[in-house]
C-alpha cells in the first residue's frame, strides 16, 4: 500500500494534506483497495460545516458503501466535481486526482493531532 509520509491520516482511513490555510482530504489507498471499484462519491456541500470524526460524505463501490469522516472540523470550501463523472479517480490516484474535498479548518493545528503514515500503517 502507498501512504505518503508527507500526509497525515485519520484512524477512519482519510488522509490530509495542508495547502496554504486549507486542508485537502480524501480516502487512503488502503480504504479504496478494501472497497474495490468505486461507482459513486457523495461529497459534502460547499459552505457546509464538518466536524472532526463525523460523517461528511459517502463512497459507494460495487461491493459496499462507506462513510467518509471529516478528519478536522471546519468549512467545506471546494469539492472535487470530477468525481461525479469519474469516481474511479479515487481508485486510480487516491492522493492526487482522487482528492474528495477541501476544508478551511477551524484550527489548522488540529492536523497535527492526526496520525503519521507510520502510525497509520501500524494500525492496519
Curated annotation (Swiss-Prot):
GO BP of this protein: glycine decarboxylation via glycine cleavage system
Residues bearing PTM N6-lipoyllysine: 63
SS bond partners: none
Cofactor field: (R)-lipoate
Keyword tags: Lipoyl
Annotated Lipoyl-binding domain residues: 22-104
Coiled coil segments of this chain: none
Record InterPro entries: 2-oxoA_DH_lipoyl-BS, Biotin_lipoyl, GCV_H, GCV_H/Fam206, GCV_H_sub, Single_hybrid_motif
PANTHER family to which the protein is assigned, alphabetical: GLYCINE CLEAVAGE SYSTEM H PROTEIN, GLYCINE CLEAVAGE SYSTEM H PROTEIN-RELATED
Primary role: The glycine cleavage system catalyzes the degradation of glycine. The H protein shuttles the methylamine group of glycine from the P protein to the T protein.
Protein name in UniProt: Glycine cleavage system H protein
Species annotation: Acinetobacter baumannii (strain ATCC 17978 / DSM 105126 / CIP 53.77 / LMG 1025 / NCDC KC755 / 5377)
